[in-house]
């Protein structure tokens, strides 16, 4: 039986019809791949820019509540969220604010946390952490200004507020001294030592020496307990008595030793331990 001519195809034609594009096999063997046709992305981009993110309306409502009703109308995480609006302008900051509060327990805990720990929270980068620490520093300086050039003993609540803001959320023990003049006005506030989570080395001779250098006639000792419990230890009491005796020999008065915890403080003088 005679066979008819067999259809052949050129490089540009296929012997059958197809609706699917067929790749040029030459591109798999060293030839330059063919570039796909350029797509016009402008309409999609324009639509994306025009459509507001879902959290923008929420931001405006939160701002309005703060503007009209003040901070008492907002939860702690919402106050933090308002602040994060400016620090992280193109993200939903509500989950970040909630995560920060959950991690550190409170607003005070967030602002008292070291920058390195802040960056462990998802969404908080180094710049945001530094901004939060800057805000904390402004708050500390503001509180410190409340006790500067005033008689410290008559502004005791301000002293406690300042010490709590400065030390309550430190992760290591810190020993601080407030040096006072003969009118009990603050001369200097200095950190004398930093230690471990449960101990700070304190040298009574160095405490008294620094008081003489500043011409201080009285001091207030302050240190924190990172555990959160401000209850004084036997070592705290004994160390305080040694400093009192060393200072007394040079007519320097130790007014008190305050221990700062996360949620409160203890005065050794108030407990009649000194």
Swiss-Prot record:
Biological processes, Gene Ontology terms: proteolysis
InterPro entries, alphabetized: MPN, RadC_JAB, RuvA_2-like, UPF0758, UPF0758_CS
Region (Disordered): 1-37
Positions contributing to Zn(2+) binding: 223, 225, 236
Segments forming domain MPN: 152-274
Top-level taxon in the UniProt lineage: Bacteria
Gene3D superfamilies listed in its UniProt record: 5' to 3' exonuclease, C-terminal subdomain, Cytidine Deaminase, domain 2
Motif JAMM motif: where in chain: 223-236
Pfam family, one: RadC
Annotated keywords: Hydrolase, Metal-binding, Metalloprotease, Protease, Zinc
Regions of compositional bias (Acidic residues) in chain numbering: 10-22
Signal sequence residues: none
GO MF annotations, alphabetized: metal ion binding; metallopeptidase activity
UniProt family annotation: Belongs to the UPF0758 family.
PANTHER family from the UniProt entry: DNA REPAIR PROTEIN RADC, UPF0758 PROTEIN YEES-RELATED
Protein name in UniProt: UPF0758 protein RHE_CH01848
Species whose genome carries this gene: Rhizobium etli (strain ATCC 51251 / DSM 11541 / JCM 21823 / NBRC 15573 / CFN 42)
